[in-house]
Design a protein with these regions (language model features):
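A short, basic N-terminal segment
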Residues: 1-63, 83
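P-loop NTPase catalytic cores that bind/hydrolyze ATP
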Residues: 107-115, 285-314
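Short amphipathic alpha-helical interaction segments
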Residues: 373-390, 395
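The catalytic "switch" region of P-loop NTPases
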Residues: 4-14, 168-287, 293, 412
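Short, cationic-aromatic polyanion-contact patches
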Residues: 397-414
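Winged-helix-like regulatory helical subdomains adjacent to P-loop NTPase cores
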Residues: 296, 300-374
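Alpha-helical DNA-recognition elements
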Residues: 83, 307, 386-390
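P-loop NTPase nucleotide-binding core
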Residues: 13, 19, 49-53, 57-187, ...
Length: 414
């Protein structure tokens, strides 16, 4: 066995010494199988009930799920689709992350066509847009001549990819074909609208009003700044349900930690929150501290979990003691500092936040604005939003304004 083989075996053994097959934390729920997602998905009962109540109605609905980046919108959406796949086999559910530079009609057309691999017309639509298909798509032509007998020659050639010229019409045709096979309806879930420019999102939504009110159910996810500021005020009738996801409370976060660990535990699964074994390799005290620091933000929770378990494995320990937890926090803090160092303006604002404790339009001074090289507070809001998206700050609503406070990891340093 080579040295590299030895190191691989040692790495695997270090995780197993923690009682786990693998590190279960992941920032990308789309990589998870439905069975795994069902095991780790925690909380959101009220929100799930609101969504599933709509599915007891024959009328097609349009649902908007919105919230800050990293709040768990994708996991929530995928859990709904997983349940519907099991409970509504006669409903076709599709999922797609919004590609850049595509309108919603074309995006929905791609999602639906991919979900119908046996439909030749659907696959032809994909092929014409240059999207690979399972079946080889050819255009067949014929040449015929007549003498004493009929003579026919047939030839096939590739169809050249083209941009969808009438995606709305093509989508309607494909929906009709899909509804013949799925009488309970078609649900098209479009994720990640928050990864687009807010102005672009508003344009997309305005242009897509026709398809959103068409023959399919729609579920969309996005950021409040990109969607709700426009749609929930000027176009309130576009969605039947606008659902905001907030941070999880501490008891739910603690239960989520148990579910994550159980999904990768080698044996001795335990889901009793009062049993210390349920959070192994954490100790009850370190599990509670970990959940407190994660602030109920699912993506931040996963980032911290990855760092803490990786640190524990590298140290070769079997339990996450307060000292090991602190080492894990130090590891992710180093990564955060490196990330900030690459962003000059965000770094300067974060340093000011660390000094001030909080920052808002009402509290920032003229001297501080000059120090940052701007003339008004509105100029730094986009940077504060990006810091929020990367879990460096959090928003704290106050009476007259939104204040931003820094997210600081616990430190044992004096």
């Amino acid at each position: 066995m080579t040295t590299a083989d030895d190191i691989f075996e040692q790495s695997a053994n270090n995780i197993q010494n923690l009682g786990l097959r693998e590190i279960p934390f992941t920032e990308s729920p789309t990589d998870l199988q439905n069975k795994t997602l069902d095991r780790i998905f925690t909380g959101r009962e009220k929100e799930l009930r609101q969504v599933f109540n709509l599915f007891q109605n024959r009328e097609r609905r349009r649902i908007l799920i919105y919230g800050r980046i990293g709040i768990g919108k994708t996991a929530f959406l995928l859990e709904i689709l997983s349940v519907l796949t099991r409970k509504r086999p006669k409903m076709l559910t599709t999922y797609i992350s919004l590609p850049s530079e595509l309108d919603l009609a074309t995006t929905a057309l791609i999602a639906l066509a991919k979900a119908l691999p046996d439909d030749d017309w659907a696959q032809r639509q994909l092929h014409q847009m240059g999207i690979p298909t399972a079946k080889e798509i050819k255009e067949r032509t014929s040449e015929a001549g007549t003498n004493a007998v009929f003579v026919g020659k047939f030839s096939e050639k590739d169809i050249a990819p083209t941009k969808a010229q009438y995606p709305t019409v093509s989508l309607e045709i494909l929906l009709d074909r899909a509804l013949e096979k799925y009488p309970d309806g078609v649900l098209i879930a479009i994720d990640d609208l928050d990864k687009q420019n807010p102005r672009r999102v508003r344009e997309l939504m305005h242009d897509a009003q026709g398809i959103l009110k068409g023959k399919a159910w729609f579920m969309l996810t996005g950021h409040p700044l990109g969607i709700t500021g426009d749609l929930l005020t000027s176009e309130r009738g576009l969605f039947d349900l606008q659902l905001k996801l907030e941070e999880l409370d501490q008891p739910t976060t603690y239960k989520m930690l148990i579910n994550y660990l159980n999904s990768a535990r080698i044996n001795n699964n335990c889901d009793d929150v009062n049993d210390p074994r349920s959070v192994l390799p954490f100790l009850p005290e370190t599990a509670k501290e970990f959940c407190r620091v994660s602030l109920g933000k699912p993506r931040f929770f996963n980032r911290l979990g990855n760092a803490v378990l990786s640190t524990a494995a590298n140290l070769g320990v079997t339990h996450i003691t307060p000292e090991v937890l602190q080492q894990g926090f130090k590891t992710i803090e180093k990564d955060r500092k490196l990330l900030l160092a690459e962003k000059v303006m965000e770094n300067r604002i974060f340093q000011l936040l660390q000094k001030r404790g909080s920052l808002s339009d009402e509290t920032i001074t003229i001297e501080e604005l000059e120090l940052l090289g701007v003339k008004s507070y509105s100029e730094i809001v986009p940077y504060l939003e990006r810091l929020d998206d990367e879990d460096f700050v959090q928003r704290s609503p106050q009476l007259d304004a939104i204040a931003y406070t820094p997210i600081l990891l616990p430190s044992s340093d004096p």
